[in-house]
């Protein structure tokens, strides 16, 4: 809002008001991110508890021991998933932004008068391009939480015998919970610091 007020040439008091609202919005956003991370962590713990409960109901209850290689492998894979997801999401944002830069340069080159203010840029084309790029780029990262557990369960059963997949999947859930919480907190505080720098 402050940028719009500045570009519109509105009076200084409008800018002061928008700055105050912006500060309140940033504070609210930072606080609610913490709540969201906490609730996601609790939801992940409930998911693990439900997993063990369903194993017990099915008569396939396993002991998730740290001396079990299947559990250790699951822990490492689970610990890797949040980092992999974060990296893929950041790469996706970079590629989507790059496509917008190319489109903006094309419009400056082909539509005469944009810099002088005599012609309007094609906003809808840039927004449409960004929307399509964002959806396309997030397909693979969004498949990670679906495909990795299936691959771990099937792969470990093939490699280490029947029952290893169940134990590895339990380890994977625990690993994802632990590293996922810390990655989320790190990204939240880092992003908040960069946002308010």
UniProtKB/Swiss-Prot annotation:
Task: Read off the InterPro entries from this record.
Answer: PPase-energised_H-pump
Its function?
Proton pump that utilizes the energy of pyrophosphate hydrolysis as the driving force for proton movement across the membrane. Generates a proton motive force.
Can you name this protein?
K(+)-insensitive pyrophosphate-energized proton pump
Primary site of residence: membrane
Family designation: Belongs to the H(+)-translocating pyrophosphatase (TC 3.A.10) family. K(+)-insensitive subfamily.
Asked if the record carries the keyword Ubl conjugation, the reply is no
Residues with site note (Determinant of potassium independence): 29
For this UniProt entry, the molecular function terms from Gene Ontology, in alphabetical order, are: diphosphate hydrolysis-driven proton transmembrane transporter activity; inorganic diphosphate phosphatase activity
Transmembrane stretches, by residue range? 30-50, 70-90, 139-159, 168-188
Q: Where on the tree of life does the source sit, at the highest rank?
A: Bacteria
Give the reactions, separated by semicolons, that this protein catalyses: diphosphate + H2O + H(+)(in) = 2 phosphate + 2 H(+)(out)
Its placement in the membrane is given as:
Multi-pass membrane protein
Alphabetized UniProt keyword annotations: Cell inner membrane, Cell membrane, Hydrogen ion transport, Ion transport, Magnesium, Membrane, Translocase, Transmembrane, Transmembrane helix, Transport
Q: Quaternary structure?
A: Homodimer.
Enzyme Commission identifier(s): 7.1.3.1
**Which coenzyme or cofactor does it need?**
Mg(2+)
Please give one Pfam family short name: H_PPase
Location in the cell reads: Cell inner membrane
Organism source for this protein? Allochromatium vinosum (Chromatium vinosum)
Give an example GO cellular component term for this record.
Answer: plasma membrane
């Amino acid at each position: 809002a402050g940028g719009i007020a500045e570009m519109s040439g509105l009076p200084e008091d409008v800018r002061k008001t928008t700055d105050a609202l912006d500060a309140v919005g940033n504070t609210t956003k930072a606080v609610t991110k913490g709540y969201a991370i906490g609730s996601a962590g609790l939801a992940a713990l409930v998911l693990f508890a439900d997993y063990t409960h369903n194993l017990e109901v099915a008569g396939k209850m396993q002991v998730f021991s740290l001396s079990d290689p299947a559990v250790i492998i699951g822990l490492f894979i689970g610990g890797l998933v949040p980092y992999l997801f974060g990296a893929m999401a950041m790469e996706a944002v970079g590629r989507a932004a790059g496509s917008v830069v190319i489109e903006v340069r094309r419009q400056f080159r082909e539509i005469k008068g944009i810099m002088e203010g005599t012609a309007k840029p094609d906003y809808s084309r840039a927004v449409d391009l960004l929307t399509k790029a964002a959806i396309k780029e997030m397909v693979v990262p969004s498949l990670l939480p679906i495909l990795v557990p299936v691959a771990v369960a099937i792969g470990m059963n093939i490699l280490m015998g029947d029952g290893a997949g169940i134990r590895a999947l339990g380890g994977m859930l625990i690993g994802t919970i632990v590293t996922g919480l810390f990655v989320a907190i790190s990204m939240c505080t880092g992003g908040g610091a960069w946002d308010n720098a």
